[in-house]
Regions:
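Electropositive phosphate-/nucleotide-binding environments in soluble metabolic enzymes
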Residues: 106-109, 193, 197, 229
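Structured loops at beta-to-helix junctions and adjacent beta-edge loops in soluble globular domains
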Residues: 85, 136, 154, 188-190, ...
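Short, well-ordered beta-strand elements
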Residues: 163-164, 174-191, 290-295, 379-383
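Short, surface-exposed loop or secondary-structure junction motifs
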Residues: 1-179, 203
């Protein structure tokens, strides 16, 4: 079916939980922008498309911009979107939906530059609007993030930059602005394999000239300490990032602890530098494999827990078989054993194998499936996929 704002509201209204408490982390969400569009419609009494046309597009002279609120409407000069095939050719890849606000803006590079020029001058809506648009978010921990009001604020080659990318189906776009140089670049492409951000910054390089910092201060050097081979071995093996259930592994090669093949620099007996990021293993774990904390250069923190390899027998896999239903998604899946492997089966009988990533967890068929038990029996399974951290399916059979 063609998705509309009515369908979006229906789906959102069925959600029972959040990925995290507001302010604990940052994760982009389309839903917030969809809800904003609906909110504008309810407050103004106008469609979001009409409100945008009269209050934003026409005042800014964006005469070739409109929302894709009816994907069947013929739009003059609209480019068809494509994506590459494995055979080296292209096939059409169009967005057949009417949901908009999060995306779905039909526009041109010229109109995008008119929009971002107003973010530079504030000619329309004034200085308070500009301040609000560029104010970066702050998490509960006090850490400032790059994301402001639909804008990413940061630096490119030492130059202050405000940018955002976008994509849907086979369309790709990137809009960047360098406020101190009064420079903006917009790139749009109708090929799903295009990288408009790279193209835009290549153009920007031609104009930024001497503003580019070619000798940025080097990251502070860290002095390596010596860690015995036996201690390094304690940190090896597979780990799960608890936030998104991704599986990662540490190994020791040529006397160095490695993460995904990259050698880490020991800066303490339990701390290892990974560029400007740091892994810190629990020093109080005793003889057991320790948990770890991964801190990114911008201060984001990921908890990592050790996980043992899981090589289940057919009898082990049978514990996970059954039907699981999600009222939130209005979907029911079956898990069955097929040819010695667990497989997720949809209502059409299509079976997709999933492989073990740890006890009670399997990867494949669109994400990671984490099974939960009560009283010695599997009762539910959570789907972790991209920005969905815990979509719960209850066992019904």
């Amino acid at each position: 079916r063609v998705h509309t704002h009515t369908h979006m509201l229906d789906i959102v209204s069925r959600q029972k939980s959040l990925n995290y408490e507001p302010g604990e982390f940052y994760s982009y969400t389309n839903t917030g922008y969809n809800l904003q569009a609906v909110l504008v419609e309810r407050v103004s009494g106008m469609s979001f498309a009409e409100f945008s046309r009269t209050r934003v597009f026409e005042p800014l002279g964006m005469m070739k911009t409109e929302w894709r609120d009816d994907y069947n409407r013929i739009v003059k000069d609209r480019a068809v979107a494509y994506s590459p095939t494995r055979e080296g050719s292209f096939r059409q890849n169009m967005p057949f939906e009417n949901v908009h606000g999060n995306g779905g803006l039909l526009t041109t590079v010229g109109d995008l530059l008119k929009f971002t020029h107003n973010l530079q001058t504030g000619a329309l809506w004034g200085p308070e609007f500009l301040k609000e648009m560029h104010t970066q978010g702050v998490l509960n921990s006090g850490r400032q993030i790059a994301y402001a009001s639909g804008l990413n604020v940061g630096k490119y080659k030492g130059v202050r930059e405000v940018q955002h990318s976008g994509g849907t189906a086979g369309y790709r776009g990137f809009l960047t602005r360098f406020p101190d140089q009064d420079l903006a670049v917009a790139v749009m492409c109708n090929a799903g394999n295009a990288n408009p951000g790279r193209f835009a910054r290549q153009v920007a390089d031609l104009y930024l000239g001497e503003a580019i910092v070619t000798d940025e201060p080097a990251a502070p050097t860290v002095e390596a300490v010596e860690v015995s081979g036996a201690d390094l071995e304690r940190f090896t093996g597979a780990y799960i990032l608890t936030r998104n259930q991704q599986r990662r592994a540490f190994s020791v090669v040529d006397g160095a602890l490695r993460f995904g093949g990259a050698a880490l620099v020991p800066i303490a007996q339990n701390r290892f530098a990974f560029g400007e990021a740091v892994f810190e293993f629990d020093a109080e774990s005793g003889e057991q494999r320790p948990s770890a904390v991964f801190t990114t250069p911008d201060g984001d923190v990921f908890q990592m827990e050790p996980v043992e390899d899981f090589d289940p027998s057919t009898d082990d896999l049978a514990e996970f078989t059954g039907e699981y239903s999600s009222p939130e998604a209005e979907v029911t899946y079956s898990f069955k054993v097929r040819e010695g492997s667990l497989a997720r089966v949809d209502r059409y009988g299509r079976a997709i194998p999933v492989r073990p990533s740890g006890p009670d967890a399997f990867v494949g068929a669109g994400g990671t499936w984490v099974f939960h038990s009560e009283g010695g029996r599997v009762t539910s399974v959570s789907l972790v996929s991209g920005r969905v951290w815990d979509l719960r399916f209850e066992r019904v059979r």
